[in-house]
Regions:
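Acidic-and-aromatic substrate-binding clefts and catalytic sites of carbohydrate-active enzymes
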Residues: 24-25, 105, 253
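Active-site metal-binding loops of divalent metal-dependent hydrolases
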Residues: 21-22, 226-228
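Alpha/beta catalytic cores of nucleotide-metabolism and tRNA/nucleoside-modifying enzymes
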Residues: 217-218, 223, 229-285
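Alpha/beta enzyme core
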Residues: 31, 35, 102-223, 232-242, ...
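N-terminal capping/small domains of soluble enzymes
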Residues: 1-95, 101
Length: 285
């Protein structure tokens, strides 16, 4: 049974990864989670200099979810390179570094610094909604999305994932802009907007199918995220066309979520005698 997926030439042992900002840089969860079981660890955002983050309180529970405004607090690239990369290299999982910045130059500085480090991919965060400078300004203007993507690609030695903001009128426009700028992969929230898939029948749960932006709108691999807490959630995203999934908020209330989801996908494949997880990707159209 094959659970491996490939993103921009990088092979992951399974399609389950952590969502940036919900898993630290791996060490924080390593007592609960065998990081070797994950397709990839996506680190918390890393900037060129330390960021203090937003004032407290930063987190509030709401019905059905959680509000957070951490502000991308991080110790900066120097500490990350010395402390976090050596820790992650102990594990048999891919390392994806989330890069944040306030200007194009900030992003480029981090990308260049990571060029010779043993990391597998870069995720460029232009989607964070709670930093007053940078982040969201890039993510809401298609010309800016294309420009920052092109600049990052020009300086990057690793494949580039562009993490897009959901807070736009049409995320397809932003996705196409990132594609035009040379992105290798996209991270997208709400891939399944307004859609429910019956994973047992592998078809839409209702006849009047509708959905988000997975499919032919862009030709790049998509990492789906947003509300993934169970294997069934992950399978829906895969069947809708996501090449991999990121697990976020679920990590806060269930530190075992990522491994449980990976195991759940394997159990589903055994139950339905599916030899290759890639057979599930985009199987519902």
């Amino acid at each position: 049974m094959n659970t491996k997926v490939t993103l921009a030439g990088v092979e992951l042992k399974n399609p389950v990864m952590t969502a940036s900002g919900t898993f630290g840089s791996g060490a924080e969860y390593s007592e609960f989670v065998d990081l070797n079981r994950l397709g990839a660890v996506v680190t918390k955002g890393v900037a060129n200099v330390p960021w203090p983050g937003n004032p407290t309180p930063r987190i509030a529970e709401v019905h059905g979810g959680m509000l957070n405004a951490i502000g991308l607090q991080n110790p900066g690239i120097d500490v990350f390179v010395k402390r976090d990369i050596p820790f992650l290299k102990q594990y048999d999982t891919k390392i994806i570094v989330n890069v944040c910045g306030k200007t194009t130059e900030d992003y480029i500085e981090v990308v260049e610094r990571l060029g010779d480090e043993p990391v597998d991919m870069l995720e460029i965060n232009i989607s964070c909604p709670n930093v007053k400078e940078g982040g969201i300004a890039f993510g809401q203007d298609p010309k800016a999305v294309e420009a920052i993507t092109r600049e990052v690609k020009r300086h990057a030695k690793q494949p580039v994932i562009m993490k897009l903001s959901p807070n736009v009128t049409d995320i397809t426009v932003m996705a196409k802009a990132a594609e035009a700028g040379g992105a290798d992969v996209l991270s997208l929230i709400n891939t399944l907007t307004g859609m429910k898939i019956d994973i047992n029948r592998r078809t839409f749960a209702i006849a009047n199918k509708t959905g988000g932006m997975s499919g032919p709108a862009v030709k790049l691999p998509i990492i789906g995220m947003g509300g993934i807490a169970t294997a069934e959630d992950a399978l829906e995203f895969l069947m809708a066309g996501a090449a991999a999934v990121s697990v976020g908020t679920a990590n806060f209330y269930n530190p075992y979520a990522t491994v449980e989801i990976a195991e759940g996908i394997e159990n589903y494949m055994k139950k339905y005698q599916i030899d290759d997880v890639n057979q599930l990707i985009g199987c519902v159209k």
